[in-house]
Amino acid sequence: MSYTGFVQGSETTLQSTYSDTSAQPTCDYGYGTWNSGTNRGYEGYGYGYGYGQDNTTNYGYGMATSHSWEMPSSDTNANTSASGSASADSVLSRINQRLDMVPHLETDMMQGGVYGSGGERYDSYESCDSRAVLSERDLYRSGYDYSELDPEMEMAYEGQYDAYRDQFRMRGNDTFGPRAQGWARDARSGRPMASGYGRMWEDPMGARGQCMSGASRLPSLFSQNIIPEYGMFQGMRGGGAFPGGSRFGFGFGNGMKQMRRTWKTWTTADFRTKKKKRKQGGSPDEPDSKATRTDCSDNSDSDNDEGTEGEATEGLEGTEAVEKGSRVDGEDEEGKEDGREEGKEDPEKGALTTQDENGQTKRKLQAGKKSQDKQKKRQRDRMVERIQFVCSLCKYRTFYEDEMASHLDSKFHKEHFKYVGTKLPKQTADFLQEYVTNKTKKTEELRKTVEDLDGLIQQIYRDQDLTQEIAMEHFVKKVEAAHCAACDLFIPMQFGIIQKHLKTMDHNRNRRLMMEQSKKSSLMVARSILNNKLISKKLERYLKGENPFTDSPEEEKEQEEAEGGALDEGAQGEAAGISEGAEGVPAQPPVPPEPAPGAVSPPPPPPPEEEEEGAVPLLGGALQRQIRGIPGLDVEDDEEGGGGAP
């Protein structure tokens, strides 16, 4: 039996025309009864696989719409003498039977697929024998399992891949991963790639397109199985590089299962090591050697098993080295980052220390400013004390001479001195009167030394005005008002309102009580003045009949400072209400030595002075109660003391 082999470059071809298609035998191979005369399996389906990059020359079979085997005019010279032989008929029948099986299997596999026209012809291919690989398989068993096919696979071989050519070309290396090893070997061997399935393997695969498992020869039409290996369909399932909603991936059968497992085990570290390796080494073989690490497919050639094993071992060693290098690089990078972070912390600490230093300096400056302000305030207070007229017993202060003169002649001042005269010896009360008059004269002399007295007085008033530091948007201004100390009430500076307040019953009752408390407080101030060492010495001299107010200028300055301090303490304590009471109570014990100088000249006066001293604690307690807001509780005792005085 002779047959014609369809090998590129051969001179023998076979041409036969069946005019009577009904005479063609039918056969059942477990898939149903197929007749080549029908259109089943051929209509709308073009199947071709070869190795030419272009389809200009077509070698092999091409199915025409007339259901006849015809060779194209561009084929090699036909041998018409062999068309009438019986052996040719049997050969063609077997060929038709086997070709009927292929489209049926493909149509079952590609459910809902869109196929090309039936008029397309088969492209040329190189002879390849796959019997060595498929010897253990059944006669008509395909190279993949039907159970793993998805019914939703819908794809067109002609036009649906065109839109993804560029995308697939860019992602071809990473998408197919290790399964693309066979394609790379074919590309290095200089063998032309296949252009079957329309343009399926032409542009999308490029140099990565893969041949069938038998890389040396294609299967013969008379072999046990003419169906191509599942390696032919790599890249058609899963991966996400193709449209249509179906899951295209890395082959079928056991290979697809293995690739599913390996795909799940892939991590981003594998791709990172690839990139680092390429950047460092730059050799084109490293991605292929790394790809063999996860290659678990069965479609490797038997002739190249040793070579692939060598490549796999080299790939494993290379990948391990790459991983180690990447780990070392990662550790180095982490160390560098840590060093940078540590380096950043030091300047931060330095910045913090500088901030602390700045804060400390600011605090020191603020403290210095506060101390300076306090010093200025003290100096101002001293200046005010020197130029201001003061009546310590009545707690009256003023910057003007006429006001001070009017105060000394006022009823208020005289009543206070009368009350003090009833509680103290007459000579002591007279000494206090002379002391206040002499102090007023000294203040007048000090005021004459000041050049701009009026400006100084105005400056003092400005300093006392706290509203100057408040901005105008707060709408706060200084106003003049009358303060009623008896009623503890501020009254607007209006004549009618002030007169109305003065005529009220509450004000009259409060002012009488306040007058008694003011007299008692004046007695306490008098005792505090007499307890001063300098003033007590003057009092002794005054009692002896000498003039105590004719001292040297140096002594006068010392006395003024001492007297000013004592009087100011008493006056400020009385004004505050608390400090005065505290000073008045402890000031009482030193008072008893006062009768000693009085007892020397007139013996009778000491006993009355001692009796008067017994009433002093009551005055102090009444003052404390008045300060605490309970005025008038000691009125009866005060009236008794006051009644005895007049």
UniProtKB/Swiss-Prot annotation:
Ubiquitously expressed. Expressed in the brain cortex (at protein level). A zinc finger (C2H2 AKAP95-type) spans 391-413, 484-507. Residues 264-381, 545-646 are annotated as: Disordered. A motif (Nuclear localization signal) lies at residues 274-279, 362-364. The modification Phosphothreonine is found at residues 267, 292. GO terms for cellular component: chromatin; cytoplasm; nuclear matrix; nuclear speck; nucleoplasm; nucleus; PML body; ribonucleoprotein complex. Phosphorylated on serine or threonine residues possibly by PKA; probably modulating the interaction with TMPO isoform Beta. Residues 564-586 have a biased composition (Low complexity). The modification Omega-N-methylarginine is found at residues 208, 217, 237, 247. Interacts (via N-terminus) with DHX9 (via RGG region). Interacts with TMPO isoform Beta, PRPF40A, RNF43, lamin-B. Interacts with HDAC3; increased during mitosis. Interacts with EBV EBNA-LP. Interacts with HIV-1 reverse transcriptase/ribonuclease H. This is A-kinase anchor protein 8-like. The gene is AKAP8L.
